[in-house]
């Protein structure tokens, strides 16, 4: 939903995936704003294929570009996004393959360019990990997630220089 001229506009879908879930999804969308773009990242299941998508708006949310599929393997979701600059985001997400579940990040530009994934950590795919959180502060990328070790929930974190991504 957008607010223009002090009035709320009629809500519009970022993209109509056609996904229906009977219950409360763990995966909600995440949005980020730069001085010229809005980006939304979300988990969906499209024709039986779990996906993580990103879509950019260059019109202050009036319309969104065709979604860009992010995941390479089986998506779990748990998405977070932040803008690196006006044209590029970092997206964090979880996906799994035959060897386990992983927390990964990618850089995505509003022109559709996608970086190779960076694996941050092997991670438990269950709900106990929560939703990993991503922030960019002074050109440094911070990721924090929950792990269950030694009978306790603990936080793990990593700091990356955004210039090296």
Regions found by a protein language model. Give the residues of each.
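Extracellular, repeat-based ectodomains that mediate carbohydrate processing or recognition
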Residues: 1-165
